[in-house]
Amino acid sequence: MNVIWIVADTFRSDHLGAYGNKTIRTPTLDALASRSVRFERHYIASFPTMPTRADHATGRWSMSFMGWEPLPEGQTTLAEILAGVGYHTAAVTDTPFYLRGDMNYDKGFQSFFMHPGQDAQFPEEMLHTHRHESQDIRAAWRHESDRNAPQTFVRASEWLQRHYKEDFFLYVDPWDPHEP
C-alpha cells in the first residue's frame, strides 16, 4: 500500500462538496476524496502550523510539551517508521518552517524537496517586471502556475511519476490556504 498525505493548512472541510457542502464547488477535491480515505471525525491536537506538523510527524499531541520548536532528536517520526519497513519516504513542501532554525522536520524522509515559495525572495526579474508592484511579490503572480501551491504539487507529481512503482510515503504540504 502506498500513502500520499496531503496537508491542507487552515482548509475547512465544511467548505468541500465531499463533506456535504452544496454551495461551494470543489469538483477536483471531491473526485480525489471519492478515491481516498477520508476522516469524518479528525480533530487537531495543536492549532499553530508547526506544532500541528509535529503531531503529524510523531503521532503525539505535541503542543502541550514542545510548542513551536524543533522536533526532539529522540522522537521517532512516521517517515522513519515507514522507511524502516522499506518505504521510500519523500516530502514536498513550501511551508517555510520545516528547515528553518534546525527545526528537524525533514527527519526520516529519504527525499525532501523544499520549494522556496513562502520563504524566499521572488526571482529578481519577476520583481521588476511589473512596475511599482515589487513591494508585494504576489503582484508578480500572473498565472495560477506562478503560485506556490501549484508549484509544490507539480514537484510532488514529478516525484510520483519517477517512484510510483515503489512502495512509498509521499507527504505534500503546501502552505496555502492560510491566513484568514
Where are the language model's segments positioned?
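Catalytic domains that recognize anionic headgroups
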Residues: 1-180
